[in-house]
Amino acid sequence: LYHIALRECGIMWKNPIYLFCMVIFPIVVVIFFTTLMQGGVPTDMPVGIVDQDNSHTSRQLVHKLDAFQTTKVVSHYENIAEARHAIQKNEIYAFMVIPNGTEAGLMAQKQPKISFYYSSVSLAAGSLLFRDLKTISTLGGAAAGMAKLSALGKTNNEIMTFLQPIAVDLHMIGNPYANYNYYLSTVMVPGLIMLFIFLITPYSIGTELKFNRARDWMRMASNNPYLAIAGKMLPQTLIFLSIFLLFEFYIYYVLDFPHPGGALPIILLGILSVLACQCCGIFAFGLMPSLRMSMSICSLWGVVSFSICGATYPLFSMDSPIQAIGQLFPMRHYYMIYQMNIFNGFPMSDAVL
C-alpha cells in the first residue's frame, strides 16, 4: 500500500492536471463564491417611481420606500411606458405607480389603488423588491388611517390596535439575517469540490490503462485490485480531505457562518463526502472501463447533483422516480446532513433516519 501510494504521489507530481483540479481550482472556487456574496443580502437595488399624484402623501411614500435597505429610488418617470422601457433596458428592477387622486381618495375613504411592477428575471431581486413594495403600499394606507384617527382624538395604543388587531411575532430560525452567502456558499462550493473528486478519480484510474501502466500497478499490488485501488486513492483522499476541511474551517470559523451543530458533524461530513465521491468515481469506471466514458458519466452525475440535491428546489416536490434517484447522489446526502446536523443543530441520529 505504501509503495503504491508513493508511486501515485510521483504521478501526481509530474502531471499538472492533479495540481490544478485538486488544489488550485478548489481554492479559486472557495474565494470566488465567498467573496461574490460577501454582502449577504442585495442592497440598494434600483427602483423607479411614476408619481401622477404629486401630493404630500405620495412624496412621503417615496421617501419611505427609499429608506428601505434593499431598495433605492433612482429615477422618476412621467408615465408607465417610460418606466416599463427602463425595466426592459435593465436600468431598474421595479417601479411603483401612484395614480392621480391617491391622497384625496385616502381622505375620502374611497380605497385608491397603488400599482407596482417588478421583474422576476432575477428571482432574488424580484422577491425582495416585491416584499418592499407590498410593505410600502400597506404603510401608505396605515399612515392615512393613523392621521385620521389621531384627528378624532384616539390614543396611540388605540390607533395601533385598530390598524393591526393581531401583532405578528416573526422569528427566522438558523439564519436571522437572510444571508444568501450562508445558503449558497455552503452548497455550491462543496458541490464543485465534489465535482472535481468525481472527475479526478476515474481520470487517475483511466490513465493507467491509457498509458499502459496497469500491469506495473497491479504487480505492485500483487494482483489484488482492492489493494491497488486503496493505494492509488490514498494520496488523493488525503489532499481532497485537507481541502474540504480547510474550506469548512474557513467558512465556519473565519467567516463565522452559523454552525450550532458543532465541529464533530463538520469533520464527519467532510470525510464521508470525499469518500462517497471517490467511491462513485470508482464505480463509474468499473461500469464503463473507458477514460472518456467514465469521466463523462461522472461529470454528468456531478452537474445534475446541483439540481437534485434539494438546495434550490425541494426534492419532495419532484416526481417520485426523481425522489428515488436523488438518493444516489452524494451531494443530496451532504445537503441533508448539513441542513439537519450543522445548520439546525439537530442530533446526528436524525440523519440516519
Give the residues covered by each predicted segment.
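Juxtamembrane interface at the cytosolic side of transmembrane helices
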Residues: 198-229, 233
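Extracytoplasmic/periplasmic domains immediately adjacent to an N-terminal transmembrane anchor
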Residues: 1-182
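Membrane-spanning alpha-helical segments of multipass transporters and channels
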Residues: 33, 54, 238, 242, ...
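Alpha-helical membrane-protein architecture signal
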Residues: 2-6, 182, 221-222, 226-234, ...
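Hydrophobic alpha-helical transmembrane segments
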Residues: 124-141, 174-189, 207-220, 240-248, ...
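Cytoplasmic juxtamembrane interface segments
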Residues: 110-128, 170-172, 203, 281-303
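Long, hydrophobic alpha-helical segments
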Residues: 184-204
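Alpha-helical transmembrane segments of multi-pass membrane proteins
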Residues: 10-14, 190, 226-239, 243
